[in-house]
């Protein structure tokens, strides 16, 4: 697999760069019509089955529609396993803070970041996406907004957002031969008036890129925005098969 620097630095056209970034490095069950019909009870076969559950036609021509009752056990299973993990919110432990005020303040700030990012409700969303659609990506980002939410004056707020196939987002993790992530890309659509516009976004350890679909091609609208922490600012989780 080519190094990420090669993908961006060998003079490729934007369409070719995106094609290379779409080389998904993990194998997961795709969130297609097949899985959706399993997960969504209203899509179960019994709802439309008129062969094994036939309607009864009376002698006077009236029809008694057969009872077709679906059971959303797959969705219930996903909800239950997510509740097992997150109904009682995980608690984080901080060591070696007892006699160090600086460390205590850091731990307090971390907890306030999670609180104001609503991490507990975000975890529920992430859990359902992970167990139902096999993958989820959570990105952390800053918003310029002066505040004192974290116990000290700050110019920025730290927020997070999760993406999954259940939201119509395609995820493309790119790993090297040691399974270290070298790029994380995702493709999504947004409404602009009556028009749906496709976007392709990529994060590497030091750069952020964003393309917008323009006509039949792609237009780069964020070209290598610097990531100062030198890490992909997100977490990707995946499993080969759905929990159900």
Regions found by a protein language model. Give the residues of each.
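Extended, helix-rich architectural segments
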Residues: 1-166, 175-179
């Amino acid at each position: 697999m080519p190094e990420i620097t090669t993908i961006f630095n060998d003079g490729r056209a934007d369409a070719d760069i995106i094609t290379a970034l779409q080389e998904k490095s993990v194998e997961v069950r795709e969130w297609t019509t097949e899985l959706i019909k399993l997960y969504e009870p209203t899509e179960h076969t019994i709802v439309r089955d008129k062969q094994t559950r036939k309607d009864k036609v009376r002698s006077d021509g009236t029809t008694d529609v057969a009872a077709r009752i679906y059971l959303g056990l797959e969705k219930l299973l996903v909800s239950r396993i997510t509740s097992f993990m997150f109904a009682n919110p995980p608690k984080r432990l901080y060591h070696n803070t007892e006699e160090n005020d600086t460390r205590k303040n850091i731990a307090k700030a971390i907890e306030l970041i999670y609180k104001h990012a609503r991490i507990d409700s975000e975890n529920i969303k992430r859990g359902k996406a992970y167990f139902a659609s096999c993958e989820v990506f959570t990105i952390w980002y800053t918003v310029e907004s002066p505040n004192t939410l974290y116990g000290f004056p700050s110019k920025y707020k730290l927020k997070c957002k999760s993406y999954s196939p259940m939201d119509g987002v395609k995820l493309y993790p790119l790993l090297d031969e040691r399974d270290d992530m070298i790029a994380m890309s995702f493709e999504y659509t947004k409404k602009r008036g009556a028009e749906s516009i496709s976007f392709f976004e990529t994060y590497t350890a030091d750069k952020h890129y964003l393309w917008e679909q323009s006509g039949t091609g792609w237009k780069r609208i964020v070209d290598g925005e610097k990531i100062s922490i030198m890490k992909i600012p997100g977490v990707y989780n995946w499993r080969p098969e759905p929990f159900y």
